[in-house]
Each structure stands twice: as C-alpha cells, then as structure tokens.
Amino acid sequence: MASSVSTVCLWVLLIWYSYITSCDSSSTPRAVTHPVLNATSNFNPTAGFYSFSCNADTYLLRLNSFSSIWALMNVFVVLVSTVVFMTYLCFTKFVHTLIYQQK
C-alpha cells in the first residue's frame, strides 16, 4: 500500500512539474478588463498583496511559488490523514458494535 501511495505521489509531482515548466513564467503583464466597469488597468505582478489596489480581480495566483507548493502539500497531508483517521474510527466503531452489542 505504501509503495502505491508513493507511486501516485511521484506521478502527481511529475505532472505538476511538467505543468509548471510548460507555463510561460516570463510573460509580460497584460491589461485586465473589468466586465462590470469595462475599464482597463495595467496589472503589476510585483504589487503588494495587502495593498488597497489588490483585489480578487487583479491578483494572479501562481502555482510555481514556494508558498503555494507548501500550501498544496499541507492540504494533501491533511486530507490523507483525515481519511486514514476516519477509516480507523469507523472501523473500530463497527467492530465494537459487532462484538459488544450482540443481543
């Protein structure tokens, strides 16, 4: 089981790496069109995340930064540990019910 999980993780990392390397990370900033206001503004990728000009329409999420990789790994670890814990919990309750609740 452990080897199959490690194989799946290796394939996921390989696919993710090929996706990141195929993305054009050296692209120039483009004008962003707001559909409601129909206004354009120049997107500055170095603008601060906490500035007032940064909102959901102008902030570009990048999956090739260290913090995004770390966050995705944390989400994966939490999901796997939750599944393992819930499987253990449900299995022990099922066995406990079978053994001690027979009447």
From Swiss-Prot:
Membrane topology recorded in Swiss-Prot or TrEMBL: Single-pass type I membrane protein
Membrane spanning stretches: 69-89
Virion surface side: 26-68
A Gene Ontology cellular-component term: viral envelope
Signal peptide: 1-25
Annotated compartments: Virion membrane; Host membrane; Host Golgi apparatus, Host trans-Golgi network
Lineage top rank: taxon: Viruses
Residues in compartment: Intravirion: 90-103
Similarity comment: family membership: Belongs to the herpesviridae glycoprotein N family.
UniProt subunit comment: Interacts (via N-terminus) with gM (via N-terminus). The gM-gN heterodimer forms the gCII complex.
Function per UniProt: Envelope glycoprotein necessary for proper maturation of gM and modulation of its membrane fusion activity. Also plays a critical role in virion morphogenesis.
This protein's name: Envelope glycoprotein N
Lineage: Viruses, Duplodnaviria, Heunggongvirae, Peploviricota, Herviviricetes
Gene encoding the protein: gN
